[in-house]
Amino acid sequence: MKKTFLPIFLVILLASYALANPQVTFSRDWGPGKK
């Protein structure tokens, strides 16, 4: 169970970071610091 849960969690975390990264880089006003 843990061997399958870890990779899935890692992929979700990576996808979330990849989705948030370009938004923060392209527009600072839309970043997590400013809502």
Swiss-Prot record:
Keyword terms: Amidation, G-protein coupled receptor impairing toxin, Pyrrolidone carboxylic acid, Secreted, Signal, Toxin
Gene Ontology CC terms: extracellular region
Primary localisation category: secreted
Tissue specificity note: Expressed by the venom secretory cell of the spine. The spine is a cuticular structure containing a single large nucleated venom-secreting cell at its base. It is an independent unit capable of producing, storing and injecting venom. On the back of D.vulnerans caterpillars, spines are grouped together by 50 to 100 to form scoli, of which there are eight in D.vulnerans.
Signal peptide: 1-22
Compartments (UniProt record): Secreted
Domain of life assignment: Eukaryota
Keyword check for Nucleotide-binding: no
Modified residues (Proline amide): P32
GO MF term set: hormone activity; toxin activity
InterPro entries from the UniProt entry: Adipokinetic_hormone_CS
Modified residues (Pyrrolidone carboxylic acid): Q23
Keyword Oxidoreductase attributed: no
Assigned protein family: Belongs to the limacoditoxin-1 (ACP-like) family.
Protein role: Potently activates insect G protein-coupled receptor. It activates the ACP receptor (ACPR) from the mosquito A.aegypti (EC(50)=0.55 nM) with a potency comparable to that of the endogenous ligand. Has no activity on receptors of the closely related neuropeptides adipokinetic hormone and corazonin. In vivo, does not reveal any observable effects when injected into crickets (A.domesticus). Does not induce increase in intracellular calcium in mouse DRG neurons, suggesting that it does not induce pain.
Note: Extremely abundant peptide in the venom (almost one-quarter of all toxin-encoding transcripts, and the highest represented peptide by proteomics methods).
Protein name: Z-limacoditoxin(1)-Dv1
